[in-house]
Regions:
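Divalent-cation
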Residues: 1-91
């Protein structure tokens, strides 16, 4: 039986500190709902991508994403830039 609980993962990318985006939060069920609520409170763009969140959820907290995930995460960062008109690490 497939687990139908909501899942969420959050990334942070600080170019001056990180060589790649990092997982800063992940969870299922109530924890996922809290992650999404906090993101909404802070006007952080949300993207619904169940396959990507599944892969990100397998990573350890604060782990940088592996190189084979760069393309998928670059698409997320491009989405965030389009929504916020702000490039990560810029003022």
């Amino acid at each position: 039986m497939k687990d139908e609980r909501k899942k969420a993962a959050a990334l942070r990318y600080t170019p001056e500190k990180d060589t790649a985006p990092r997982i800063v939060a992940k969870g299922t069920g109530i924890i996922a709902e809290k992650i999404l609520a906090i993101a909404k409170e802070h006007n952080i763009p949300l993207r619904d991508d169940p396959q990507l969140v599944e892969v990100l959820s397998a990573l350890d907290l604060y782990q940088e994403i592996p190189p084979d995930m760069y393309k998928a995460v670059a698409e997320v960062l491009a989405f965030v830039y389009k929504m916020t008109k702000k490039i990560p690490g810029s003022s």
